Amino acid sequence: MRGHSALMMAVVTLAAVSSGAAEVANTAAVSSDYLIGTILTFAESDRLLRVNDVDDVPVYHYPPEKGKRTTFFEDRMKKKLANPEKIRRLYWKWYSMGYSAREVVQHLDQTDNRELKEIYHNLGVGYAEFVAKMNV
């Protein structure tokens, strides 16, 4: 009877060890499958700095196959503000709404974009001159 118990204990121990090793090997195989094909990717911006760009060619941020290509906001602002009639209408709208030159400058000075900051500064200075002319 003692021999039978010892033999049963040995069989149970071997069965537990062999099934545990199979589970560990199986888990390792599955986890290594997940590691294959993982590649780190980085998002790249298509917009480039145009420091030395002297051309007035508009820069498009949509690919040509989209049909309608749109220029950057800064380029559209410069084009619209090149028309004195549109600027005058904008100043009249602000003046009729009761905005002071100080309020306009404060609201326009909320950007970190260097190109827009220059455009907005010129708008604020122009509106201050417009208000000064209207108050005389």
Curated annotation (Swiss-Prot):
Signal sequence region: 1-22
Organism superkingdom: Eukaryota
Motif (RxLR): 47-50
Alphabetic keyword roster: Host cytoplasm, Host nucleus, Secreted, Signal, Virulence
GO CC term (a single one): host cell nucleus
UniProt keyword annotation of Secreted present: yes
Lipid metabolism among keywords: no
A Pfam cross-reference name: RXLR
Alphabetized InterPro entries for the sequence: RXLR
Family the entry assigns: Belongs to the RxLR effector family.
Domain comment (free text): Has the canonical translocation RxLR motif, but lacks the canonical EER motif, which characterizes most oomycete effectors identified so far.
Record's protein name: Secreted RxLR effector protein 15
Organism: Plasmopara viticola
